[in-house]
């Protein structure tokens, strides 16, 4: 079995992908669910947002266009560089940082809204828990966390090589050659404690069988995760 820190490595594959126009092509438009929640929160006073795993900046740019003060982080230098160039072209004052989801360079209780779309399942359970602990730390009380996790209904769950509990790699399958963690809705709720899950849907993405858990959660307690 791999050490936790050895499993959060998928950003290396994405770093290569973000260097090419072909690799960036499908990741330029913000998700409709993200737009929905960001607009709703903005209407009730949310102002500080973090785009965790920002990639090439599709959601960071949208959030900035909505008037949010945006802090955007990704492990990929290529992704951050491209996102920063787009923000400069569009004159969006976004603060971009290269870093890891398990060690967020932010003060406690900094954000009203934190987005991690297709991000925090890149690693084993310990990596997920560390990332959630950091997310909980930087959210303000009442802050909203929106994102996705890989569902155990996903057609890839249980295939490939299991490198840790519910964590699989698929040799030669681009970012799937890096560890991916899967869970069901009950396990998701346990991982998120003490955050409160407000919405969970098990939805297919672009390809048949590509189920992901789409969630919205709220920080309701002041204590850190265990």
Regions found by a protein language model. Give the residues of each.
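A short glycine-rich, Lys/Arg-flanked "PGG" loop and its adjoining helix->strand segment in the class I
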Residues: 129-141
């Amino acid at each position: 079995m791999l050490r936790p820190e050895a499993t959060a490595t998928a950003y290396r594959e994405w770093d290569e992908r973000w260097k090419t126009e072909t690799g960036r092509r499908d990741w330029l438009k913000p998700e409709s669910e993200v737009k929905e929640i960001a607009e709703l929160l903005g209407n009730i006073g949310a102002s500080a947002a973090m785009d965790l795993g920002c990639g090439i900046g599709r959601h960071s740019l949208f959030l900035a266009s909505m008037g949010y003060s945006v802090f955007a982080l990704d492990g990929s230098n290529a992704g951050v560089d491209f996102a920063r160039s787009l923000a400069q072209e569009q004159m969006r004052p976004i603060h971009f940082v290269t870093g890891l989801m398990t060690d967020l360079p932010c003060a406690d209780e900094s954000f009203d809204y934190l987005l991690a779309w297709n991000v925090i399942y890149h690693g084993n359970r310990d990596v997920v828990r560390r990332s959630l602990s950091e997310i909980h730390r930087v959210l303000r009380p009442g802050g909203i966390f929106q994102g996705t996790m890989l569902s155990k209904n996903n057609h890839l769950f249980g295939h490939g090589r299991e490198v840790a509990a519910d964590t699989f790699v698929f040799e030669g399958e681009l970012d799937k050659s890096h560890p991916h963690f899967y869970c069901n809705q009950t396990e998701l709720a346990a991982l998120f404690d003490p955050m409160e899950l407000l919405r969970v849907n098990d939805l297919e993405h672009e390809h048949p069988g590509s189920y992901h858990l789409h969630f919205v959660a709220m920080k309701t307690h002041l204590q850190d995760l265990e």
